[in-house]
Each structure stands twice: as C-alpha cells, then as structure tokens.
Amino acid sequence: MLTRSWKIILSTVFISTFLLVGLLNHQWLKETEFPQKPRQLYTVIAEYGSRLYNYQARLRMPKEQQELLKKESQTLENNFREILFLIEQIDVLKALLKDMKDGVHNHSLPVHRDAVQDQATTDVLDEEMSNLVHYVLKKFRGDQIQLADYALKSAGASVIEAGTSESYKNNKAKLYWHGIGFLNYEMPPDMILQPDVHPGKCWAFPGSQGHILIKLARKIIPTAVTMEHISEKVSPSGNISSAPKEFSVYGVMKKCEGEEIFLGQFIYNKMEATIQTFELQNEASESLLCVKLQILSNWGHPKYTCLYRFRVHGIPSDYT
C-alpha cells in the first residue's frame, strides 16, 4: 500500500514539473520569434501532458465514480448495439422500398419546368403519391396467408352471444360519475372478427378457458383456421401471457344449435409468428354456417384470456 502511495506521489511531482517546464517554455516561445513548427510541436506535447494528467486523475478516482463510469460505458455500448440494429432495419426498409418502386414502375412523374404548368404538376404529384400510398397500404395490410376469411364481420359474420362466454369485467374499463360506475367499455366478443389488431383491442373473458360461437358470412366446408395475437414487442406490459395457447374448433350443425363436430385441436405458439394458420384435422361432411372456438388454456395469465382475431377458411357451398 505504501509503495503505491509513493508511486502516486512521484507521478504527481513528475507531472507538475513537466507542466511547469511546459508553461515556462510556452512563455519563452511567445517572447522569441521561433518558426511555427516548434510551436506546433510544443502544443502537441502540452496536449499529451494534459491527457497524462487526466489519466493519473482517473487512477485516483474514487470507487463510486469508477462504477458510475463503468455503467455509463455499458450504456454507450448498448446504444451502439441499438444503432447497429437500426441500421439493419434500414437495410430491410430499403429492400422493401425497392420492391415498392418495382410495383409502381409503370407510374412516372413528368418533370415540368414551365411555371404555367405548376398546377398540372401538382395534380400529377398528388395522383402519384396517392397511388404509392395505396400500394404501400396494400403491401402492409394485405393478408399474408392469402386465404378468404369467412369469419370477417364486415363480410357478414357475427357472434352468437347465447353460445359465447361472458366478457371479463374490468373495473378499469368502467366510466364513473360521482364514484358510481355506470358504463363498461370493454371490447365486445365480435372484436375478434375484425382486422383491427392493435394493443388492447381484444375480447377478454375470465380465466384461461372460454368459448365463442361464430356465425359465418356464408356456408362453407371449413378447411383451416387462423389465430392472430400481438407480439411482446408491442405489448404495453411487455408480455402476452393472456394470449390463447391450446384451443379446439368445432363445427355446429342445424342453425348453430345442433350437433357439434370436432374439427381439430391446436396450440398457438407465442414464440412464433403473430399470425398462425392451422389446417383442420377433421373434415365436415357437409357445409356449415357456424363454428365454435373453444379456448382450453392461455400462456399463464391468472385473471383472463384475450383474443385479438380469429379467422375461418374453407370452401364455399357453391363450389362443393
């Protein structure tokens, strides 16, 4: 310990002497008319002397400050990794943009330099931008699975409440007046029949088991179903433990009140893609108008399960 103290003392004396000599030389150089290069050399030496002093100061830095410096360095490293990730994403977006440009290569924007044609140019620009926006939206909103959804509400599908579990009652989803709750605004069951898949826009039911009865837009022979949920990356809570896990699908005969036909049992894997399609294990012998979705478990949420979107695919009765 004594040896280290003497080293620090000697280093401090050396640095102080070095800086003093440098200061005297600097004053002497000012009073003489030496060439510019020796002065530049002195500046470099003085700068390195300052850096050496700072390094020695860091050696004498308290442990708390060293820990703080270490944490700041780790933060900078994390930020650097995030920047690298964003650069990779930019490359992906560039590739997508190229694909978009290829999709609209038939559209061209003429260059007008005549001031009289400015309005015409603006109109063309608006049209081109509109076409590009529509193309982009089609790219992003287009069904990745490319299968007709006969459980789509806008196409005529609906939920039969008599065959559906009760919604989860959440006190946070209630309006109050003078401390008295009078209106719930939780999402209805038919939320799962709509393509608006955003955090919070899901139908929740109590616990990990529940069911919903769906009247399809038309009679079909079901061949597959699709389950969709948000990813953990966009979840406000950072997890999707309320996502469905095991579920079964049944076809219901005779105007949604008759015999149930088992069509298959599946597992929605939250670690895989947010949109997962499952081919039915059993085929119905005739066209069906109603399908029952039975949730058997979720990914660990103790209070409720949340469904974002459920689709039903198949062959219309006109083609059977």
UniProtKB/Swiss-Prot annotation:
Record domain SUN: where: 156-317
Where does the protein principally reside?
A: membrane
Where located?
A: Membrane; Nucleus envelope; Nucleus inner membrane
Q: How is this protein positioned relative to the membrane?
A: Single-pass membrane protein
Residue ranges that the Swiss-Prot or TrEMBL entry lists as coiled coil: 63-102
Q: Which GO terms describe its cellular component?
A: meiotic nuclear membrane microtubule tethering complex; nuclear inner membrane
Top-rank taxon: Eukaryota
InterPro entries under this entry?
A: SUN1-5 (IPR045119), SUN_dom (IPR012919)
Keyword Transmembrane recorded = yes
Tissue distribution is: Specifically expressed in testis (at protein level).
How would you summarize the oligomeric state and partners of this protein? Self-associates. Interacts with SYNE1 and SPAG4/SUN4. Proposed to form a spermatogenesis-specific LINC complex with SYNE1 during sperm head formation possibly implicating a SUN domain-based heterotrimer with SPAG4/SUN4 associating with SYNE1. Can interact with SYNE3; the interaction is questioned by missing colocalization in spermatids.
Q: Please report the name of this protein according to its UniProt entry.
A: SUN domain-containing protein 3
Identify the species of origin. Mus musculus
